[in-house]
Design a protein with these regions (language model features):
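Amphipathic, non-transmembrane alpha-helical scaffold segments
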Residues: 27, 136, 140-148
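Short hydrophobic/aromatic patch on the recognition helix
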Residues: 60-70
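Amphipathic alpha-helical segments used for helix-helix packing
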Residues: 80-81, 113-138
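C-terminal peripheral helix-coil segments that are non-catalytic and often amphipathic
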Residues: 1-20, 100, 104, 145, ...
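Basic, helix-initiating cap at the start of DNA-binding domains
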Residues: 1-60, 75
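Hydrophobic alpha-helical connector segments
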Residues: 90-119, 173
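Short amphipathic alpha-helical segment with a characteristic S/N-K-E followed by hydrophobic residues
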Residues: 34, 49, 72-77, 86-88, ...
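Tryptophan-centric aromatic hotspots in well-structured domains and transmembrane helices
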Residues: 69-70, 139, 143, 178, ...
């Protein structure tokens, strides 16, 4: 992973290491200020505007302070995005039906991704993950995999209810859900909206629900 600017000097690292432990509340305040500054730059001007220098200046901290938590601007950007999304998480309480649960999973993500600043940032992070293996590992583990696991839980519950066959290929079903969303997000050829979410869910269900045609 390429650094966007020079790493802090060793003296800065030593000063940080020697900081008194009683300063933890201040450290947390600094961490939140860094996340807020990074999010402001990210949403206003995109990933390219997020540099350690720019974030440090905006947050009123040293670069050494930033490097204590984030080794690169990409990991900082990902955490800043998570901090912004904290209040927009898909509901986890079951509706009692597979369709209802899948709609509840996808709607919050699509509402956020379809807004211009967030959609642009997600697209930039996906692009970065294609060219930077180290960042790709972080992106997959922290952004992609948790959402896939939420979908797996929903499909497993549907199998237990007898709503879909026990031999349903869950990984393929998860791909069927998220694939169309990312395709529209990255290419921008058609809108990401509520109707599209319903169409994706219903088309996925038609592909995995038992039918007389498949029973023979």
């Amino acid at each position: 992973m390429q650094a966007d600017d020079g790493a802090p000097a060793a003296a800065d690292d030593e000063a940080t290491a020697d900081a008194p432990r009683r300063g933890r509340p201040r450290s947390e305040k600094a961490r939140l200020a860094i996340l807020e500054a990074a999010a402001e730059l990210l949403l206003a001007r995109g990933l390219s505007a997020v540099s350690m220098d720019a974030v440090a200046e905006r947050a009123g901290v040293s670069k050494a302070t930033i490097y204590r938590w984030w080794p690169t601007k990409e990991t900082l950007a990902l955490d800043a995005l998570y901090n912004e999304w904290a209040a927009v998480q898909p509901r986890t309480r079951s509706t009692g039906t597979l369709r209802g649960d899948l709609l509840g999973l996808l709607r919050p993500w699509v509402r956020l991704a379809s807004s211009r600043p967030y959609g642009r940032v997600i697209g930039a992070l996906v692009t970065e993950a294609q060219t930077d293996p180290e960042f790709a590992e972080i992106y997959l583990s922290r952004f992609v995999e948790p959402r896939r696991e939420q979908a797996r839980v929903i499909f497993r519950a549907a199998i237990e209810r007898g709503e879909i066959p026990a031999d349903t290929k869950i990984e393929v079903a998860v791909d069927m859900l998220y694939g169309p969303l990312y395709h529209r997000l990255l290419h921008g050829h058609a809108p990401l909206n509520e109707r599209f979410v319903r169409d994706v869910v219903d088309t996925t269900l038609r592909g995995i629900m038992p039918s007389q045609e498949h029973a023979t």
